[in-house]
Amino acid sequence: MASHSPISRFSPLTSNELELVLQWRNQPHIRQNMHSQDEITWVQHEAWFDALKNDESRCFFVFYQNDRPIGVLNFSEHQSTPYTLEWGCYIGEDDVWPGSGLLLEIAALQYALELKGAAVLYAEVLSFNKSVIKLHTLFQYTPLEDGREFKRDGEKHVVKRFEYKREQWQRNKPKVLSRLPKQISAAANFIQFDL
């Protein structure tokens, strides 16, 4: 891929991307990091999309990099007081711009805490998903008490929980962005949301 900064555009999911998103959701490397590892059928996927369209507390964006769909970023209302959004994401394509995961982190913080005015951005990560835990640490999320325990493949794991308060992001943003590779900081200027 080209080394110049990509345009990272986040567009609400439409029926046009449904088949592609189902392919992504069913990829083993994506399913293994979800609460449920079950393969999703087309009927289940359509029912999920119908429910999503009628639920104002959730939004689901397709992540376009230079007009090519490569992943998703989603939000749901975690609680109303204080207004807290929970987020999740994944990249479904292999050949993406280096640092795309970092751009998802930045986009999530910008959308929730700047565009939507949430007081808190909340995240849950399965304890074996070390790369995402590392990203949240790099971005200075506040770790919370661990969530529920669960077993997968005979091993015990926990749900790691994190939050980021709006005032914390306002204070930390310049420092966090300055610690990232220069090409990532530059690419952060090209994050767009189709609202």
Name each model feature, range by range.
Residues H29-A47:
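Conserved GNAT-fold acetyl-CoA-binding loop/helix
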Residues A2-L20, W24-Q27, D67-L195:
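Acyl-donor (CoA/ACP) binding surface of acyl/acetyltransferases
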Residues D50-V62, G71:
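A short helix-loop-beta-strand connector motif used in the catalytic cores of GNAT acetyltransferases and
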Residues I40-V43, L52-N54, I91-G92:
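Juxtamembrane/interface motifs at transmembrane-helix termini
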Residues S15-L22, W42, E46, D50:
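An amphipathic alpha-helix signature
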Residues W24, N33, W48-L52, R179:
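Residues that form generic nucleotide/phosphate-binding pockets
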Residues Q27-I30, E39, N54, Y141:
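Residue-level marker of structural boundaries
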